[in-house]
């Protein structure tokens, strides 16, 4: 098997509204990340963990998934060589780094490298 999918993310203009919607729709337990408008989805009972957050100002929001990689820069460069475009990052997060790229049709996909 290749690199595993390890995280999903839903970001939009109305963080509290999205949080309530997904919590009520799927019965998800959400944990707020302090002052940052982001909540993690509990995956104790199986499934892929993820998060729901506020999209940056001027960004319409997105739904994406993150794939684990060993080298974010190498993965971004490979995506670009195959017709993709760098969309964000790399950016440091607690315990690692993330980045986004757009595939040749414009779909944004995330990359995640966790610290050992």
Segment roles from a protein language model:
Residues 27-61, 108-113:
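Conserved short beta-strand elements that form part of the metal-binding/catalytic scaffold
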Residues 40, 66, 98-100:
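Conserved hydrophobic/aromatic beta-strand scaffold that supports enzyme active sites
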Residues 14, 37, 72:
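A generic "binding-loop/recognition-motif" signal
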Residues 22:
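Catalytic core of tubulin tyrosine ligase-like
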Residues 1-19, 46-47, 63-65, 113-116:
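N-terminal beta-strand motif that seeds the catalytic metal site of vicinal oxygen chelate
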Residues 59-87:
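Mid-chain, well-packed structural core segment of small domains
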